């Protein structure tokens, strides 16, 4: 476990990397908001883009960020990122304004107890938020990421919990269930990141499991009776085993900025320098491989047998080819 003291010392070193540019997708609440708050607290003159659904509700948080870092620049982009075409439009705004992007941090999602809920683009709504839209952000912004140092992508979901998936029905058009969607979102994220780290070695990719964190996800996902039951009757029993939201933000900023998780062939610097220790082992088991599975403590989660099997079968390439094809089809529907 990376101690909180080590995390905070590393985050303080972020001031030595001025003018960091970052994009937070889902940065208006929960883990994304907490991590962005820590970036504002620690970084010197950062530029941050925040993508969310409602600018009016986000204005108080934007004011808070400006107070935390008067030299920082914080830009809100209003978008429903369950649609790939909206992801493209948001990315276009950033591409027109920036020549580099150091950090891409993605947390959009939610919880559902229902069946497949297709968007107008033919993708299940939560599957889009958890996987396809996140991959579209990466695909669109790779030119900016590759022009930067440090350069890192983080997807917060279920790194280390990979399962076997139906490679003949990756988007679950014919075999949808909540469990299958959970498995596919996680495993396809890790496989795509492994592929991208190999094909874009100047960028570091991290799939992290955040642990149990006290956020408003149930309030945002369910009507009052269900969310009230969870918040007042279930959560009190779970809270002792949870990660404080502020600490989660500090730890995720460490994941974003520490040289412990470098790109495979990135330009120096690879983040805040290490005080001690070696670089982390990646998905393939190779130190510094450029793609990492982490738990909330910053520890590397061991790569599963299924990932090794899929690597031999060249499934990472298959998954990424499918992902690119489906996203391109979606925007033309």
Curated annotation (Swiss-Prot):
A Pfam family annotated for this UniProt entry: adh_short
A GO molecular-function descriptor: oxidoreductase activity
GO terms of biological process kind: terpenoid biosynthetic process
UniProt pathway annotation: Secondary metabolite biosynthesis; terpenoid biosynthesis
E.C. number(s) listed in UniProt: 1.-.-.-
Domain of life the protein comes from: Eukaryota
Keywords from the named record: Oxidoreductase
Family: Belongs to the NmrA-type oxidoreductase family.
Protein name stated in the entry: Oxidoreductase AN1596
Gene source species: Emericella nidulans (strain FGSC A4 / ATCC 38163 / CBS 112.46 / NRRL 194 / M139)
């Amino acid at each position: 476990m990376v101690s909180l003291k080590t995390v905070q010392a590393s985050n303080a070193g972020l001031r030595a990397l001025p003018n960091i540019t970052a994009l937070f997708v889902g940065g208006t609440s929960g883990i994304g908001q907490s991590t962005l708050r820590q970036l504002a607290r620690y970084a010197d003159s950062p530029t941050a883009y925040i993508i969310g659904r409602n600018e009016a509700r986000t204005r108080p948080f934007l004011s808070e960020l400006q107070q935390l870092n008067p030299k920082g620049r914080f830009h809100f982009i209003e978008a429903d990122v369950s649609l790939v075409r909206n992801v493209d439009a948001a990315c276009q705004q950033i591409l027109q304004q920036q020549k580099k992007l150091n950090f891409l941090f993605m947390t959009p999602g939610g919880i559902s107890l229902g069946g497949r809920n297709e968007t107008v683009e033919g993708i299940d709504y939560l599957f889009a938020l958890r996987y396809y839209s996140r991959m579209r952000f990466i695909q669109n912004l790779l030119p900016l990421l590759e022009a930067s140092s440090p350069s890192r992508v983080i997807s917060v979901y279920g790194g280390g919990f990979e399962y076997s998936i139906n490679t003949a029905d990756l988007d679950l058009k014919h075999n949808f269930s909540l469990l299958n969607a959970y498995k596919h979102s996680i495993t396809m994220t890790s496989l795509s990141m492994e592929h991208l780290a190999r094909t874009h070695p100047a960028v570091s990719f991290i799939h992290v499991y955040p642990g149990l964190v006290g956020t408003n996800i149930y309030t945002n996902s369910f009507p009052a009776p269900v969310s009230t039951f969870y918040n007042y009757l279930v959560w009190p029993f779970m809270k002792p085993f949870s990660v404080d939201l502020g600490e989660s933000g500090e730890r995720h900023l460490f994941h974003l900025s520490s040289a412990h998780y470098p790109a495979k062939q990135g330009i120096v610097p690879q983040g805040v320098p290490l005080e001690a220790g070696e670089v982390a082992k990646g998905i393939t088991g190779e130190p510094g491989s450029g793609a990492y599975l982490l738990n909330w403590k910053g520890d590397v989660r061991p790569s599963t047998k299924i990932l090794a099997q899929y690597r031999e079968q060249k499934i990472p390439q298959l998954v990424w080819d499918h992902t690119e094809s489906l996203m391109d089809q979606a925007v033309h529907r």
